[in-house]
């Protein structure tokens, strides 16, 4: 450090100089609010808008018009005086604006009543200026407001389309009909919609199972989009009223439910495959290599089909 002085003295002097510099810097940037009378006269306590006052100066009040008789007596003076008075008035107004502080404060006090009277018009013009200054923002808002109803309509259109699914109704004569249903629709609703008046006669078969319970939903039966449901119309007839009781008894005997053919197809096919394999093992000379390969393929395919139907 410095010779002849201790370290503590040097540190203390450095801190004092630092604090003094900070204090001087703060005092140089400090401005007392409201202490200067000139600032108080320039900025009024009411609505402070000096830029608007200076940019829009109040025109000098015109002198009262002279009577018509005086103007008729002195036409030449009336023609010359207004020009000089207007020039003098404009020069005085410019000098007052540039130099006279009190005149500026007075005019600033005189302007607010006019603004209060036309306050609504100024607000409207200010709003129009804001909109003119930001046309991109206004355009974006309009596009957003137009896109909102379109998006809502798109959502309402997409929701029913997403909920619907197609189911193919296949009849015994190899004809098909496409049904538009929902997963929560029941078997009874499907029958009443596409077979009105024939609900009791129509039998629906899906994957070898008879859909006899009308309260079951399509979702609970694992019926998905583009599935095939086999439809069978039974020939059951209602007993007709006749005079003889014998004819009524015979008609009641013939009425009845047809046996479930779909449930018998799988056992019959299993028996047929078993017989073919029996003949293949005992009489090999009658089966060629392609016939054996095709028999193996049919057996494997049928095994996967049965496993898929009853494995769920």
UniProtKB/Swiss-Prot annotation:
Q: Where is the composition biased (Low complexity)?
A: 235-253
Keywords attached to this Swiss-Prot or TrEMBL record, sorted alphabetically, are: Cytoplasm, Membrane, Nucleus, Transmembrane, Transmembrane helix
Where does this protein reside within or beyond the cell?
A: Membrane; Cytoplasm; Nucleus
What are the boundaries of the region Disordered?
53-91, 108-161, 235-256
Q: Keyword Transmembrane, does the record have it?
A: yes
Q: Which residues cross the membrane?
A: 11-31, 259-279, 286-306
Q: What is the lineage of its organism?
A: Eukaryota, Metazoa, Chordata, Craniata, Vertebrata
Instruction: Name the residue ranges with Acidic residues bias.
Output: 118-131
* Membrane-topology descriptor: Multi-pass membrane protein
Q: Could you identify this protein by its name?
A: Transmembrane and ubiquitin-like domain-containing protein 1
**Which organism is this protein's natural source?**
Xenopus tropicalis (Western clawed frog)
Stated role: May contribute to the regulation of translation during cell-cycle progression. May contribute to the regulation of cell proliferation. The membrane form is involved in sterol-regulated ubiquitination and degradation of HMG-CoA reductase HMGCR. May be involved in centrosome assembly.
Name the InterPro entries on file.
Answer: TMUB1/2, Ubiquitin-like_dom, Ubiquitin-like_domsf
Task: Name one matching Pfam family.
Answer: ubiquitin
Principal location: membrane
Query: What are the GO BP annotations of this UniProt entry?
Result: ERAD pathway
The Ubiquitin-like domain covers: 165-238
Q: Where is the composition biased (Basic and acidic residues)?
A: 140-161
Q: Does the keyword Repressor apply?
A: no
